[in-house]
A protein has these predicted regions:
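A conserved acidic beta->alpha catalytic loop
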Residues: 38-46
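Cell-envelope/extracellular polymer assembly enzymes that use nucleotide-activated donors
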Residues: 1-3, 33
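Conserved donor NDP-sugar-binding/catalytic core segment of glycosyltransferases
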Residues: 91-124
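A recurrent flexible, glycine/aromatic-enriched loop bordering the glycosyltransferase active site
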Residues: 111-123, 133-151, 157-158
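Acidic donor-binding/catalytic loop of UDP-sugar-dependent glycosyltransferases
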Residues: 44, 64, 82-99
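Glycine-rich, basic loop-to-helix element that forms the pyrophosphate-binding segment
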Residues: 59-74
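Short aromatic/hydrophobic "clamp" motif used to bind/position activated sugar donors
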Residues: 79
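Short, well-formed alpha-helical segments that are part of the catalytic scaffolds
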Residues: 10-26
Length: 181
């Protein structure tokens, strides 16, 4: 079982496809809850989260503080961090289940996973953001916050969770390093 935490800021439109991609996981019994942690939106982000049955929190605190606070409230042993607008590719549920089972059979506390970035060919009309994200991933050769992060609560707590800054998503990926991803 896993809990999803989605970071938002004026994300009423981009939140919808992210939540839609999670529906099959909820129907399959894999996804227990979704927490939307917001940075003070002035649009209908809260209403979208409410209609979808998500728990919604809003704060002017830095992103890392919001993510850490949201993580403290979830019930599942696995946490999936996503940004609003992230749409996991088809097959992500099977990949996540396989990864979680494999990690639990080996050293479950020592591994985390990221998802593949969608290639521009998988996007109906790729925009500049999708193309730049793919190019950045190819050049950097490292995981990006746009990919999402699947991590056990034990490992999350062991590394101290998200740092307090606004660059918290990239910082936690750097702290995890390639050996744990």
């Amino acid at each position: 079982m896993l809990s999803a935490i989605i970071s938002t800021q004026n994300s009423e439109r981009s939140l919808v496809p992210t939540l839609s991609a999670l529906v099959p996981a909820a129907a399959a019994g894999l996804l227990a809850e979704v927490v939307v942690t917001d940075g003070g939106s002035r649009d209908a982000t809260a209403e979208v989260a409410d209609i979808a049955g998500c728990r919604f929190t809003s704060s002017a605190e830095a992103l890392g503080i919001r993510l850490k606070a949201a993580t403290a409230t979830v019930r599942s042993p696995w946490v999936l961090f996503l940004r609003a607008g992230a749409v996991l590719q088809p097959g992500w549920i099977d990949a996540a289940e396989h990864f979680m089972q494999t990690a639990e059979l080996s050293d479950g506390a020592g591994r985390a996973g990221v998802f593949r970035l969608p290639s521009p060919t998988h996007v109906v009309r790729p925009g500049l953001a999708e193309v730049v994200a793919v190019l950045r991933a190819l050049i950097a050769r490292g995981p990006r916050p746009e990919q999402g992060l699947l991590i056990t609560r034990r490992l999350y707590d062991a590394i101290g969770g998200h740092s307090a800054g606004d660059d918290a998503e990239a910082a936690i990926l750097r702290r995890l390093g390639r050996q744990r991803l």
